[in-house]
């Protein structure tokens, strides 16, 4: 009877007295947001773990996963799932729209549940800082879903730079071929009927309530500021993590952004961001001077480095690019840090100091999180993108969004990272943003008719972007001291 109980009882019951779940036991995992990347994450763990609960605000979009896992209990509202099944859940996978990542993740962590949250980790700087501190205070195992951080390409980039192979790095340029969804759009003028299979109130969550339009969901929410973070949120966690880790970055001190037409509700079609990071503590074989990190998307690209092979495409594997400009050489890699190479043609033989994760891009990233969940806290090896690193790295992404949305101030913004505030936005400065682009051609003649917001206090506007004011009924846990 005891053996039968051990096979059937929740692993949270079996492991808590020992502080861990034995590797032979299966985690009881709940998933929130299962129709897109959540489905992929579930597929990578379901063979070895128990998927006990599934939650989604759109049951038509989620139907395929519901059908694949008929024994899992189904929910619309993650809060009800946590209330009813909290004692039976060990860990949660979260793959909802960006604007709900933080609250769903934070609530799970405060319940003592391990969490795997898709990228971008959060929608704002404050939310990232909160999850970083909650990870430290709760001790749960955390992982952001940027699988390239576990891939060997990222390991090689770090090892080459730390071994001094390219010298000191003072400039990094990163680019993506995204967005591949609509951006630069006016707010829809018509309201569509909400499908019976979609709970629009729950999708909206802590954001302001907008009239439903089919342009927002599914997937295209990425381009709308209330729900997504544009191409930065979609791809920067894959492409900026290599410079963040390899160069030991933390908070930038200066940010600036520019873009195609900036609208108040929708991300621009293309953008450029520059973040300046102060000098860090030198490593044994390489210095860590002040460094500029540049981001390009929407077709914008950095210049081809001097000596780059003619006829060779600058952006390579995965639709992403990173160029590390060193004093001795130039290191170039694709999306996720894959296929790194040196412009000189040398092939470094640097010591392999980074832990390798097998099959990182094909489930290894998720299973490395599962491994850590089952280990004893006293000897646990955290996964490669746990929130102690993913949280500050995601702040870098959120800072890029801030730089774009505040570009109308027409200056380099100075950032106090420790206190999460800009130091050079005056109390009386104002900002206007375009609401609607009314460009038309009539009888062969163009007409330009932009509708602008009224001037708003720039400091208050920035503060709301840094720390969102949640809709009534939605509240984050308090920031741990």
Task: Show the residue positions of the predicted features.
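Short, small-residue-biased leader/transition segments that mark boundaries at the very start
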Residues: 1-5
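N-terminal Rossmann-like dinucleotide-binding module
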Residues: 7-69, 148-151, 243
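Hydrophobic residues in well-ordered beta-strands that form the structural core
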Residues: 31, 94, 117, 142-144, ...
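Glycine-enriched catalytic-core subsegment of oxygenase/oxidase enzymes
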Residues: 47-48, 55, 59-62, 235, ...
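Beta-loop-alpha module in the N-terminal Rossmann-like domain of NAD(P)-dependent dehydrogenases
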Residues: 72-130
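A contiguous active-site-proximal alpha/beta segment in oxidoreductase catalytic domains
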Residues: 114-116, 122-198
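Oxidoreductase and adenylate-handling cofactor-binding alpha/beta cores
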Residues: 151-174, 186-189, 204, 233-260, ...
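Core domains of carbohydrate- and sulfate-ester-processing enzymes
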Residues: 173-214, 426, 430-466
């Amino acid at each position: 009877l005891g053996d039968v109980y051990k096979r059937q009882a929740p692993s949270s019951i079996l492991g808590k007295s020992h502080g861990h779940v034995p590797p032979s036991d299966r985690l009881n995992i709940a998933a929130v947001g299962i129709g897109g990347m959540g489905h992929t994450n579930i597929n990578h763990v379901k063979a070895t773990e128990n998927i006990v609960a599934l939650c989604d605000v759109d049951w038509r979009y989620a139907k395929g996963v519901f059908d694949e896992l008929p024994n899992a209990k189904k929910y619309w509202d993650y809060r009800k799932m946590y209330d009813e099944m909290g004692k039976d859940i060990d860990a949660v996978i979260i793959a909802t729209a960006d604007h709900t990542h933080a609250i769903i993740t934070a609530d799970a962590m405060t319940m003592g549940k391990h969490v795997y949250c898709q990228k971008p980790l959060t929608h704002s700087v404050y939310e990232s800082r909160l999850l970083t501190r909650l990870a430290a205070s709760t001790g749960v195992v955390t992982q952001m879903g940027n699988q390239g951080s576990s891939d060997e390409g990222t390991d090689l980039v770090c090892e080459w730079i730390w071994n001094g192979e390219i010298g000191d790095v003072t400039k990094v340029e990163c680019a993506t071929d995204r967005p591949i969804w609509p951006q630069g759009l006016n707010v829809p003028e018509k309201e569509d009927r909400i499908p019976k299979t979609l709970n629009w109130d729950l999708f909206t969550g802590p954001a302001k309530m907008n009239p439903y339009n089919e342009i927002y969901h599914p997937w295209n929410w990425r381009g709308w500021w209330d729900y997504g973070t544009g191409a930065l949120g979609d791809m920067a966690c894959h492409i900026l993590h290599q410079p963040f880790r390899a160069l030991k970055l933390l908070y930038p001190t200066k940010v600036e952004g520019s873009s195609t037409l900036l609208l108040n509700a929708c991300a621009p079609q293309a953008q450029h961001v520059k973040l300046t990071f102060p000098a860090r503590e030198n490593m044994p074989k390489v210095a860590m001077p002040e460094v500029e990190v540049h981001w390009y998307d929407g077709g914008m690209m950095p210049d081809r480095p001097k000596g780059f092979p003619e006829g060779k495409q600058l952006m390579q594997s995965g639709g992403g690019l990173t160029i590390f400009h060193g004093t001795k050489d130039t290191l170039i890699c694709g999306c996720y840090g894959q296929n790194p190479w040196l412009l000189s043609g040398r092939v470094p033989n640097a010591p392999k100091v980074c832990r390798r994760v097998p099959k990182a891009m094909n489930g290894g990233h998720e299973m490395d999180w599962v491994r850590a969940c089952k280990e004893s806290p006293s000897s646990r090896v955290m996964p490669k993108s746990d929130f102690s690193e993913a949280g500050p790295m995601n702040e870098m992404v959120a800072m890029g969004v801030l730089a774009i949305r505040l570009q109308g101030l027409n200056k380099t913004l100075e950032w106090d990272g420790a206190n999460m505030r800009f130091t050079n936005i005056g109390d009386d400065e104002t900002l206007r943003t375009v609401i609607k682009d009314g460009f038309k051609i009539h009888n062969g003649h163009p007409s330009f008719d932009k509708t602008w917001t009224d001037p708003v206090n720039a400091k208050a506007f920035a503060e709301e972007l840094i720390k969102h004011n949640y809709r009534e009924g939605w509240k984050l846990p308090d920031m741990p001291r």
